[in-house]
From Swiss-Prot:
Alphabetized UniProt keyword annotations: ATP-binding, Ligase, Nucleotide-binding, Protein biosynthesis
Alphabetized PANTHER family for the sequence: GLUTAMYL-TRNA GLN AMIDOTRANSFERASE SUBUNIT B MITOCHONDRIAL AND PROKARYOTIC PET112-RELATED, GLUTAMYL-TRNA(GLN) AMIDOTRANSFERASE SUBUNIT B, MITOCHONDRIAL
Lineage: Bacteria, Bacillati, Cyanobacteriota, Cyanophyceae, Nostocales
Annotated gene: gatB
Protein name: Aspartyl/glutamyl-tRNA(Asn/Gln) amidotransferase subunit B
The keyword Ligase is assigned to this record: yes
Length: 491
């Protein structure tokens, strides 16, 4: 985990995030056009999302369901009644010259999200970040600038309206975050929650998860907030952390040199690792919000709320707490296992099939994870089923095979070979009457090594154990072999 840059102790940062999550619906928020990513430019469009005269928007009911579920998962109060509003601004990627969003009556508000960081000793440090609001809105199109990554400096710009009208939820945090590390973890935990719910894939590289940061600094102990600066254009969690750490340093240096911090929007430049000024930050009055006249107010009934609440899965933080408290796993293992919902599902099927939880966690977070990373595979793409992993672990714990044998056969097991076939004829020799003659034979065949051992070179015990394992094709029970060899050498 990336460590945070040290901030001068006389100042503290006040940070909040505005996160846009694209909802995983098949069609757009107010029309029937596809939301599929990667289509040819301007093919997933229709008269509604283009704002042509004479057409009316109709709310996609799945959007409401997903937004409410997200609000519930974030411990928000769900509004019985809410409405849509028009947010007025002119930009080439906005075909209607207004965006349908929610202003004063959002679908959800007053929630919180728990984040977890590990200290130097691997112990979890937990903190609740307040959620101000969650609201539904439509996305804008996408601009592509030739010769630059923004309009300034480009030779010309192209616009793709496929994304216009794609459903989003915007989640606004309270200014409870204090470091870039906390901000990056908040964004990652938010993505985990959305993925567990199945309401968003959270792919930053496809624009399904986008974060804007609001940040100010103030002297420690001062209650009044400093001047807020917004940062955009962060395309990874590490970029979020680095942009915040840079901006904290920039603002502190400016204050200490007597400069005035202005309320503005700045862009993070990955290449130069700095923020640059983009524009003066707008206020809500600049957007001239008013109620959307073409959409009726939204009502969430008690029946809907009860149904959607009952469909919520166990969420990442809940799993982490259960794995630590009930299964005795380390904070590190619980983080790895709960990072991806399909990994946690694999783990839980394995222990339901009889696997020791700690052993299953070790195999999944170490050997299997290394294989997945190397092969660039998902855990659903390997041939080793959770039940077969449980079988392997049980064979080790009952002394039928050794851990070394299991690791040796792991590549074949991962491609689908069953434990029965993998370990046929490979059971450990754990009968002393069978092993003892082999130990005697090995010692008799190596008189020089025996003499050296008895003259004080006790490390040669490992040599004799290794020879026994070699003669038995590693089938000798390691623990029993060690005992027999030691008794014979010292006899």
């Amino acid at each position: 985990m990336t460590s945070a840059t040290t901030v001068k102790t006389e100042y503290e940062a006040i940070i909040g995030l505005e996160t846009h999550c694209q909802l995983s619906t098949n069609t757009k928020i107010f029309s029937s056009s596809s939301t599929a990513f990667g289509a040819d430019p301007n093919t997933n469009i229709d008269p509604v999302c283009m704002g042509l005269p004479g057409v009316l928007p109709v709310l996609n009911e799945k959007v409401l369901e997903y937004a409410v579920k997200a609000g519930l998962a974030l411990n928000c109060q769900i509004a019985k009644y809410s409405k849509f509003d028009r947010k007025q601004y002119f930009y080439p990627d906005l075909p209607k010259n207004y965006q349908i969003s929610q202003y004063d009556l959002p679908i959800a508000e007053h929630g919180w999200l728990e984040i977890e960081l590990l200290d130097a000793d691997g112990n979890p440090k937990r903190k609740r970040i307040g959620i101000t609001r969650l609201h539904m809105e439509e996305d804008a199109g996408k601009l592509v600038h030739a010769g630059s990554d923004r309009i300034s400096g480009s030779t010309y710009s192209l616009v793709d309206y496929n994304r216009a009208g794609v459903p989003l939820v915007e989640i606004v945090s309270e200014p409870d975050i204090r470091t870039g590390q906390e901000a990056a973890e908040y964004a990652q935990e938010l993505r985990r929650v959305m993925r567990y719910l199945g309401v968003s894939d959270g792919n930053m590289q496809e624009g399904s998860l986008r974060c804007d940061v609001n940040i100010s600094v103030r002297p420690v102990g001062q209650e009044k907030f400093g001047t807020k600066v917004e940062i955009k254009n962060m395309n990874s969690f590490s970029a979020i952390q680095k942009a915040i750490e840079h901006e904290i340093e920039r603002q502190i240096e400016a204050i200490e040199s007597g400069e005035k911090i202005i309320q503005e929007t700045r862009l993070w430049e990955e290449g130069s690792q700095r923020t640059i000024s983009m524009r003066i930050k707008e206020g809500s009055s600049d957007y001239r919000y008013f109620p959307e006249p073409d959409l009726a107010p939204i009502e969430v009934t008690e029946a809907q709320l009860s149904q959607w609440r009952s469909e919520l899965p166990e969420l990442p933080a809940q799993k982490r707490h259960r794995y630590e408290n009930e299964l005795g796993l380390s904070a590190y293992d619980t983080r790895v296992l709960t990072e991806d919902v399909i990994v946690s599902q694999y783990f839980e099927v394995a222990i339901a099939s009889g696997a020791n939880p700690k052993a299953a966690a070790n195999w999944i977070t170490q050997d299997i994870a290394a294989y997945l990373n190397k092969q660039k595979l998902s855990i659903t793409e390997i041939g080793l089923t959770p039940a077969n992993l449980a079988d392997v672990i049980t064979r080790i714990e009952t002394g039928k095979i050794s851990n070394a044998q299991a690791k040796q056969k792991l590549p074949e097991l991962l491609t689908g070979l069953s434990p029965e076939k993998a370990f046929a004829g490979q059971e450990l020799i754990s009968d002393p009457s069978v092993l003892e003659p082999i130990v005697d034979e090995v010692i008799a065949a190596n008189p020089k090594e025996l003499e050296k051992y008895r003259n004080g070179n006790i490390n040669l015990k490992g040599f004799f154990v290794g020879q026994v394992l070699k003669k038995t094709n590693k089938r000798a029970d390691p623990k029993l072999t060690n005992e027999l060899v030691e008794n014979k050498l010292n006899g």
